[in-house]
Structure formats: C-alpha cells, structure tokens
C-alpha cells in the first residue's frame, strides 16, 4: 500500500473546541430515572443523584452535557420541571411513549452538573413551543432578579442565576419523527426569532442550530441551504 503526504505551510491546524467531546442526558429509558437520578440507590446523595455515576462522569472528564434532549425536548414544557416536586404535573411523553413524572427538571440538572464538574448546555423546545417559552427559560436560569421568571427561580430556592452559556435551538427538526417537525425555512424563521429574543434576554449566551439529522434524510444538504436564506 502506498501513501502520499502533502505538506502545505499555508494551512494551520486549528484548536479543537473541547465541547465537541461533550455528551447529553435525555428523559429516555433509564438515562435520568435509574441512571443519574435514583434516590433509593445505595450511592444516592441528598439530591437523589447516584454517586457512582457522578464519579464515572468525573473520570471521563466530560466538558459539557446537553439537557433535556433529544426528541423529548420537542414536547417538553420546562415549567413542569421546576418548583416543589410534589406539585409538578405528570405528562404523557409522546416522544418515547411513557409518562413523565417531572421529578427531575432544570434546577436538578444544574445541580447535577456542578457535582459532576461539567458545563450545562440547555435545549429549548422549538417543536411544539417557540421563542417566548425559550426566552422565558433563559430569564429563569440566567437573570439575576427583579423579573417574574428570575424571581420565581429565587422563590424555588435558587438565589443566584445558573448562568447557562450554551443553548441548543430545538432537536432534529428536519425529522418526521419529531414533534413539530419543520421545513428548513420554517425552522430558520423560528430559530432566528428565538435566538434573537434569547440573546436580548442575556447577550452573553451562544445559540446552536440544528443541522440535518441524518445523511439518509431526503433533505440532507438542502436543509442547510434552505435555512441559510432565512
């Protein structure tokens, strides 16, 4: 076997963003319940987080974790997962055909990330919801005080904002399996407006768009081109 090596001094090797090596946690199977959160487990701490899982995540040195999904996020009402656990509603999860008890939500995830020494990446629902709900979540997590959503966070027992910097705008929105699936143009419009309003709420954040979910998709390639014209 012969190999050819081409050296070109004009090309520079860029620094790889460590976030590429991140992971995500979704309300799917035993990922959350029975995975990272299991109050009755022998290693569970005062928050119900499994200590053995946290130790393993620390060993992996995971730089960032996305939450709450995944397909799950496209039908998720983030408000269901904050406040007193006993008052949180149970919802049908159409993504995975289960019932979501909402024992574990936004604030629990933030606390888990701190214990696991990893950064939070939040995903917002752009399937069944939109820009207003997305910017409200940014206000809840990142605004210090003096507004309805930030004061609600404080009422829930979290005086300081979580200061989440990276936000994912939906999940696999080109897929027919996704709740609220969209064309590239439809997604581009809602993503643009959501990102704009989220950054008006907190100018320090970054937002991440959805690309094609699969090379086997009929819109692969055209999805990115169509979105670029928005």
Regions found by a protein language model. Give the residues of each.
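Conserved small/polar residues in nucleotide/adenosyl-binding loops
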Residues: 228-230
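Non-catalytic accessory regions flanking glycosidase/transglycosidase catalytic cores in CAZymes
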Residues: 1-226
